[in-house]
Amino acid sequence: MILNSSTEDGIKRIQDDCPKAGRHNYIFIMIPTLYSIIFVVGLFGNSLVVIVIYFYMKLKTVASVFLLNLALADLCFLLTLPLWAVYTAMEYRWPFGNYLCKIASGSVSFNLYASVFLLTCLSIDRYLAIVHPMKSRLRRTMLVAKVTCIIIWLLAGLASLPTIIHRNVFFIENTNITVCAFHYESQNSTLPVGLGLTKNILGFLFPFLIILTSYTLIWKTLKKAYEIQKNKPRKDDIFKIILAIVLFFFFSWVPHQIFTFMDVLIQLGLIRDCKIEDIVDTAMPITICLAYFNNCLNPPFYGFLGKKFKKYFLQLLKYIPPKAKSHSNLSTKMSTLSYRPSENGNSSTKKPAPCTEVE
């Protein structure tokens, strides 16, 4: 727990009750290395996604709009990752000033909410395209997708405002270091509880339930279609993809959400054990690496589910320029089959039909 002491030169001076918590040599070596790997891999992968979707595929589908925005949100976060790598390598000494502390912290929070919201919308879009392909045609338009993305960016920015406002540079007197951190006044318990619960519920629980429900309904619909076609290998492939999407999201974010909640309890003074605080402070950067590495891999992962995305990706690697006119659409293995009403208009008689393009 950190206690307030005084304010000098515009920087609040505080005391740290557990000054050694989370400060281990292997953390100062391992975490910057992982941050560097995430930065290189994420910058490369997400940049290629932006180039392929915008210049090669011409941004013609709803799914491509969500994927493009997902990649852009990741790139915004990745640009601040070198700051966190330096910060950790310098044993949690922040040399970049208060403004960059706020910007970098806000970027992390913004990416969390924007990415999760976009993945949720992408799962809803897949649900509508596969389970209700005819009914959703008029609703799944490019205009609706673009407006939805604007709303998501605004909501993510709004959810990140408390982080930007309350994350500051502090000087810890008993360790003689300057940190970029949250600091809650002991008499104000509303703020940390609100931030923690918002991150847990709005940034994970609700989106996960929507994603789980969407892909469960998608699986049931495709399962019926494959049973009619007696295509068991294809059914198994789709099941593995859906299972991977849901499990990757869950296990990537659950550790970070758990330790975020524990960190709030520490800041509130409800946990006053330095051993527990050491565990939390040590685990937190590891869970951050896990969560945001998965985040930065999401756009390439979802993109490579489409055959045409892979085709244009290979063209890009071979330095083949995009054509002036393209009629390509982003496709995914999960949208290979959908239910369409039979020609006789009997809604109770349905047959599986190919639906390879995400519209």
Swiss-Prot record:
InterPro entries: ATII_AT1_rcpt, ATII_rcpt, CCR1-9-like, GPCR_Rhodpsn, GPCR_Rhodpsn_7TM
Disulfide links within the chain: C18-C274, C101-C180
TM region positions: 26-55, 62-89, 99-125, 142-165, 191-216, 240-268, 279-304
Chain positions recorded as angiotensin II binding sites: Q15, D17, R167, F182, H183, Y184, K199
Predominant location category: membrane
Record topology, Cytoplasmic segments: 56-61, 126-141, 217-239, 305-359
Residues anchoring lipid (S-palmitoyl cysteine): C355
Membrane topology: Multi-pass membrane protein
Listed Polar residues bias regions: 335-350
UniProt GO MF annotations: angiotensin type I receptor activity; angiotensin type II receptor activity; C-C chemokine binding; C-C chemokine receptor activity
Sugar-modified residues: N4, N176, N188
Description of post-translational modifications: C-terminal Ser or Thr residues may be phosphorylated.
Keyword entries, A-Z: Cell membrane, Disulfide bond, G-protein coupled receptor, Glycoprotein, Lipoprotein, Membrane, Palmitate, Phosphoprotein, Receptor, Transducer, Transmembrane, Transmembrane helix
GO BP: calcium-mediated signaling; immune response; maintenance of blood vessel diameter homeostasis by renin-angiotensin; neutrophil chemotaxis; positive regulation of cytosolic calcium ion concentration; regulation of vasoconstriction
Cellular location(s): Cell membrane
Residue span of region Disordered: 335-359
A single GO cellular-component term on record: external side of plasma membrane
Residue ranges that the UniProt entry lists as topological domain Extracellular: 1-25, 90-98, 166-190, 269-278
Subunit structure of this chain's protein: Interacts with MAS1. Interacts with ARRB1. Interacts with FLNA (via filamin repeat 21); increases PKA-mediated phosphorylation of FLNA.
Protein family membership: Belongs to the G-protein coupled receptor 1 family.
Entry function: Receptor for angiotensin II, a vasoconstricting peptide, which acts as a key regulator of blood pressure and sodium retention by the kidney. The activated receptor in turn couples to G-alpha proteins G(q) (GNAQ, GNA11, GNA14 or GNA15) and thus activates phospholipase C and increases the cytosolic Ca(2+) concentrations, which in turn triggers cellular responses such as stimulation of protein kinase C.
Record protein name field: Type-1 angiotensin II receptor
Gene giving rise to this polypeptide: AGTR1
